């Protein structure tokens, strides 16, 4: 698994070579990654080489070749943008792009996919294709598979979730009453709401009086994941 800085450098080298035909210089890499010394770039390149993503060609200046890319980013690498969080709202911890959380020596960073945009009701296809990636300190999420979604409405505003926030979701198919979930309705429509189990029915509650509460038979609802946090960029 790549750290956030390793991923960022690999992406930068690939795109630079695609645009210019030559690898970037160490100074260009240092500037792009906002590092203060070339030694940090040397360590990142060594780590990428050891993991089989790049190789250095001997006796040639600026001779770095990208051998392969992580599978999750090869589909749309030229337009992908890595997002670093500014605020993680579930524990109010602030992170800056230059924070030690994203330093080369920090080995507990992970990259999760942003799988589309979610609203009160969208087709399932809206969250089935990765549109971006998100770099997070690993200690901010729990065990399991995670993904992110961009919020596109104000249906959960009274729960502190705003339009354009990015929500972090742990993939799971069960939930406790009162938790905010991603739900698939009738295998066609996806929504994110507060989950309530009441007898032989499931209630999905918005956190905005302008949106209706929906009640379903259990067989119509499939839980796709549970909200564990959100990121808000200022």
Curated annotation (Swiss-Prot):
Described by its record, this protein's role is as follows:
Represses a number of genes involved in the response to DNA damage (SOS response), including recA and lexA. In the presence of single-stranded DNA, RecA interacts with LexA causing an autocatalytic cleavage which disrupts the DNA-binding part of LexA, leading to derepression of the SOS regulon and eventually DNA repair.
Q: Give a GO biological-process term.
A: DNA replication
- Biological source species: Bartonella henselae (strain ATCC 49882 / DSM 28221 / CCUG 30454 / Houston 1)
Q: Which InterPro entries match?
A: LexA (IPR006200), LexA-like (IPR039418), LexA/Signal_pep-like_sf (IPR036286), LexA_DNA-bd_dom (IPR006199), LexA_repressor (IPR050077), Peptidase_S24_LexA (IPR006197), Peptidase_S24_S26A/B/C (IPR015927), WH-like_DNA-bd_sf (IPR036388)
| DNA-binding region, residue intervals | 26-46
This one is known as LexA repressor
Question: A single Gene Ontology molecular function, please?
Answer: DNA binding
Q: What is its EC number?
A: 3.4.21.88
Show the active-site residues.
155 (for autocatalytic cleavage activity), 193 (for autocatalytic cleavage activity)
Write the gene name.
Answer: lexA
Q: Which reaction does it catalyse?
A: Hydrolysis of Ala-|-Gly bond in repressor LexA
């Amino acid at each position: 698994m790549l750290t956030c800085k390793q991923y960022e450098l690999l992406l930068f080298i690939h795109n630079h070579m695609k645009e210019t035909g030559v690898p970037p210089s160490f100074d260009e890499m240092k500037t792009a990654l906002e590092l203060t010394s070339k030694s940090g770039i040397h360590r990142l390149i060594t780590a990428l080489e050891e993991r089989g993503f790049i190789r250095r060609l001997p006796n040639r200046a600026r001779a770095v070749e990208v051998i392969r890319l992580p599978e999750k980013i090869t589909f749309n690498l030229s337009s992908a943008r890595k997002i670093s969080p500014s605020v993680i709202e579930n524990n109010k911890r602030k992170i800056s792009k230059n924070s030690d959380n994203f330093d080369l020596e920090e080995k507990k960073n992970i990259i999760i996919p942003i799988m589309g945009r979610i609203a009160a009701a969208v087709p399932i296809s809206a969250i089935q294709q990765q549109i971006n990636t998100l770099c997070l300190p690993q200690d901010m999420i729990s065990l399991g598979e995670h993904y992110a979604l961009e919020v596109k409405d104000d249906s959960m505003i009274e729960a502190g979730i705003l339009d354009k926030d990015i929500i972090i979701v742990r993939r799971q198919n069960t939930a406790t009453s009162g938790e905010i979930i991603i739900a698939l309705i009738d295998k066609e429509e996806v929504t994110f709401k507060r989950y309530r189990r009441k007898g032989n029915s499931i209630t999905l509650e918005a956190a905005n009086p302008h949106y209706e509460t929906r009640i379903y038979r259990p067989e119509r609802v499939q839980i796709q994941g549970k909200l564990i946090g959100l990121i808000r960029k200022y």
